[in-house]
Amino acid sequence: MNSSNLEKLNCKSSIRDEVVPSRKRVTLPPWLEVAKPRLIPLLLATTLGGMALTEEWPLSSPKLICTLGGGALAAAAAGALNCLWEMELDKRMTRTSKRALPAGKLSSETVFLAAVSCTLAASMLLVSGVNYLAAGLTLLGLFSYVILYTVILKPRTTKNIVFGGVAGAIPPLVGASAATGHVGLSGWWLFGLVMLWTPAHFWALAILLKDDYASVGIPMLPSVKGSVFTAKAISRYGWATVLMSIMGVFALPEGGLLYGIMLLPFNGRLLQLINELKKSPDDLSRAKSLFRWSILYMFGICLLLLISRTQLSVEFEQQSMQIFFSILSLLSN
């Protein structure tokens, strides 16, 4: 291999190291590492988003704590079971070979017992402190991630994240059901938004890791179809995400106007980064930027939903409507 090729490989490796959580930069205890704690905050954020879409928001502190606590425990269990199932695969990938299980820092038995314990604790917390529907949906999310995505879809199809993304889209349903005892159309709206957002978000990361996935035979879209095809697919799902996000104006019980206004820069930035990647699909720095922004985007959507349910937002909407009708009245005279 000549020096030019080596430089290109080193450049790609450097960019991947920047975007993918590095054990060199953040060293977690083995027992915490297998729980995949980096994924949990966004799952809890979308749970809060589901709650904010209901008339019952805000929830009482005990119910809120039980819902988020149960969700965090279930997510930790799902992460541990995922690590357990993919232990042999992780051994074969340079990026993951030093993780707790493949490196022998934890035994399989210990991780399995911890996952079962977290699952039982999550179930008891949600059943006793929230309701059966929230508990059932949480368990559905856990098993869809472990069985549907990890075991069935991930090793078999390039559409793995399209259908497997249902696991990450269930928390809004948990939040809505925790608040009301049922899901409701607004909860399903946020479920749909997360489902559309997930492929664009994950494929941006998969572009960075396509060589890693290809080396172990995992059929991620960029590894099979290439970056150009993937960038076009990201664009389609990105536009669908933007259109779906706008529907939040109508999904909110109140405060939709302020949500719609604050949403504009989020969608504008998302489309800008998607367009930049589409122009240069092999530019790893652009894939990195899109991946990072997509995370902030979903956190931002959930924050906007919470802000829209404040009294300030309601007053803003009322005053805006008064001004609007005053202008109409002046124009008609």
Curated annotation (Swiss-Prot):
Source species, domain of life: Bacteria
One of the GO BP terms on file: heme O biosynthetic process
Transmembrane intervals: 64-84, 110-130, 133-153, 161-181, 189-209, 246-266, 287-307
Keywords: Cell inner membrane, Cell membrane, Heme biosynthesis, Membrane, Transferase, Transmembrane, Transmembrane helix
Catalytic activity: heme b + (2E,6E)-farnesyl diphosphate + H2O = Fe(II)-heme o + diphosphate
Subcellular location: Cell inner membrane
Family to which the UniProt record says this protein belongs: Belongs to the UbiA prenyltransferase family. Protoheme IX farnesyltransferase subfamily.
PANTHER family, A to Z: 4-HYDROXYBENZOATE SOLANESYLTRANSFERASE (PTHR43448:SF7), PROTOHEME IX FARNESYLTRANSFERASE, MITOCHONDRIAL (PTHR43448)
Name this polypeptide is given: Protoheme IX farnesyltransferase
Organism: Prochlorococcus marinus (strain MIT 9215)
